[in-house]
Regions:
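Alpha/beta-hydrolase-fold enzymes
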Residues: 63-190
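Short, surface-exposed "cap/lid" segments of acyl-processing enzymes
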Residues: 1-33
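Catalytic active-site module of serine/aspartate enzymes centered on a nucleophile-bearing elbow/loop
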Residues: 236-276
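Short beta-strand/loop motif that positions the catalytic acidic residue
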Residues: 203-204, 209-212, 216
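The feature captures the conserved acid-bearing segment of alpha/beta-hydrolase catalytic domains
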Residues: 192-205
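Conserved alpha/beta-hydrolase "acid-adjacent" motif
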Residues: 217-223
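Catalytic cores of eukaryotic secretory-pathway lumenal/extracellular enzymes that build
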Residues: 27-47, 65-68, 244
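Alpha/beta-hydrolase fold nucleophile elbow
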Residues: 40-64, 84
Length: 276
């Protein structure tokens, strides 16, 4: 059975576009800046939502899409996205410590660490399995150990330190604020001393399908129940699916992702296209 979300849809005849957020291995091209320059890394999910977003949705991708839809006052963007399948959705400063450029870069250091932890042997694959689940959630028996080398050849792929700072600000704030630049710069950028909050309740026009799990430690169920489901307009929630025994990585790499997530999403889109 095909285990790739993209190929499940492509094999069914759908056009598929894959996006890479800024800072990842394939998201480092710029018309005037180079990744070696600090200015290149002056972005967070604010800029991803404002300038970069495409119809993709897993983990941080859901936060970016929710934010972009919340900023869509005239509904022009929502008209382009008929249905949005949000997998492991996320709703709700250590700048000097992390530096000012990229965080978890795709370079020789992370490659060496990944190779050391995630080797080719069965024992090494199991060790890698355990290390990854420390941040994603408890082991679910969905991990395909034979694909470990493929997964770790591209991950981690990197992001900006500013993006990590923005995430920390959001955690401390308890909601979804724009990036906090400090009072002086906030006044210049936003016209007020504090960053504005994004109102997910303002989202309209796009049907949202939520796929989440109690075992996901990053797309936390408390965040889903106490924030997303309360903030989103019930009229836009087309589906609210609580999957059993999915950790954060299983939505992309789990053996059960195709039958429990990808194929149901494919059926919804196919029925929609056929007018059923």
């Amino acid at each position: 059975m095909v285990q790739s979300y993209a190929f499940v849809f492509a094999d069914a005849g759908f056009d598929v576009w894959l996006g890479n957020v800024r800072g990842t291995t394939y998201g480092r091209k710029h018309t005037s800046l180079d990744p070696s320059e600090t200015a290149f890394w002056q972005f967070s999910w604010d800029e991803m939502a404002e300038f970069d977003v495409t119809a993709m949705g897993h983990s941080q991708g859901t936060l970016i899409m929710f934010t972009r839809l919340a900023k869509d006052a005239d509904g022009s963007f929502a008209k382009k996205i008929k249905r949005y399948f949000a997998l492991a959705p996320i709703g709700a400063g250590w700048y000097d410590l992390f530096g000012s450029k990229d965080f978890l870069p795709d370079n020789w250091i992370t490659k060496m660490a990944t190779k050391d932890i995630c080797g080719a042997s069965e024992a090494e694959a199991e060790k890698c399995d355990n290390e990854l689940f420390l941040i994603a959630g408890p082991e679910s028996d969905q991990w395909n150990a034979s694909r470990t080398a493929v997964y770790t050849s591209q991950d981690p792929a990197g992001t900006s330190t500013q993006n990590i700072v923005h995430w920390m600000q959001m955690v401390r704030h308890g909601r979804v604020p724009a990036f906090d630049w400090g009072k002086k710069m906030n006044k210049k950028k936003y016209g007020q001393n504090t960053p504005p909050e994004y109102d997910f309740g303002a989202i309209k026009g796009t049907k949202i399908h939520l796929y989440w799990s109690d075992n996901d430690w990053l797309g936390d169920p408390t965040d889903i129940n106490d924030f997303l489901l309360k903030e989103l307009n019930p009229a836009v929630i087309a589906e609210n699916t609580n999957l059993k025994n999915f950790n954060h990585l299983d939505f992309s790499w789990g053996l059960s992702a195709t039958p429990e997530v990808y194929l149901p999403a494919l059926k919804t889109c196919t029925d929609d296209y056929l007018g059923k």
